[in-house]
Amino acid sequence: MIQYRGGYIASCYAQALFSVSSNVNSICKNAEFVVSVLENCNDISLFLSNPRVSREDKVKLVEVIGDYIDSILVKFIMVVIENNRGNILLQILNTFLDLVKKHNREVSISVTSCAVLTKQEEEGICDALFEKYGKVVSITNNIDPSILGGFIIRVNFDVIDVSLNSYLQSLRELSKMAIRSSISE
């Protein structure tokens, strides 16, 4: 079994959710909503993780959230709570989202640029990376003025650095090497 972000147990739960999801994209959107809630509201995450909080109280909370999400996901979260796995719910859902991306042949990338990318630039990057990886690309654009121009792309463990700052550093290194070699001659 493939081990994703949350470890073996989270992976098992995520694969179970994936296998019972008749409409994966609908469940995916709902899972993204729950992940957002858990990441942005630390109290809810701590509440679900706390072993001193009764299952009944946790179930009541899930029922409140259940008004906004798919019934399959609500039932799944109830099973997670009943099995005392509320402490890894975020990991389970993130692993599920990774499975959906893999199923849809998607890859998330991070693009660091000195300014916000235009729609045209994003499309160009997506097209180029689709050719390279054969997957649909979703971009997260991070702004870092220190790179001066160009961009840095991070895809899993690959880094493509075509920033002006990187280019200038390379020129500095080449200049130093040229000066050293001319002095030694």
From Swiss-Prot:
Pfam families: OSCP. It is a peripheral membrane protein. Disulfide bonds: none annotated. GO terms for molecular function: proton-transporting ATP synthase activity, rotational mechanism. Gene3D superfamilies: N-terminal domain of the delta subunit of the F1F0-ATP synthase. InterPro entries: ATP_synth_OSCP/delta_N_sf, ATPase_OSCP/d_CS, ATPase_OSCP/dsu. It is found in: Cell inner membrane. GO terms for cellular component: plasma membrane; proton-transporting ATP synthase complex. Coiled coil: none annotated. Keywords: ATP synthesis, Cell inner membrane, Cell membrane, CF(1), Hydrogen ion transport, Ion transport, Membrane, Transport. The keyword Cell membrane applies. F-type ATPases have 2 components, F(1) - the catalytic core - and F(0) - the membrane proton channel. F(1) has five subunits: alpha(3), beta(3), gamma(1), delta(1), epsilon(1). F(0) has three main subunits: a(1), b(2) and c(10-14). The alpha and beta chains form an alternating ring which encloses part of the gamma chain. F(1) is attached to F(0) by a central stalk formed by the gamma and epsilon chains, while a peripheral stalk is formed by the delta and b chains. F(1)F(0) ATP synthase produces ATP from ADP in the presence of a proton or sodium gradient. F-type ATPases consist of two structural domains, F(1) containing the extramembraneous catalytic core and F(0) containing the membrane proton channel, linked together by a central stalk and a peripheral stalk. During catalysis, ATP synthesis in the catalytic domain of F(1) is coupled via a rotary mechanism of the central stalk subunits to proton translocation. This protein is part of the stalk that links CF(0) to CF(1). It either transmits conformational changes from CF(0) to CF(1) or is implicated in proton conduction. Belongs to the ATPase delta chain family. This is ATP synthase subunit delta. The gene is atpH.
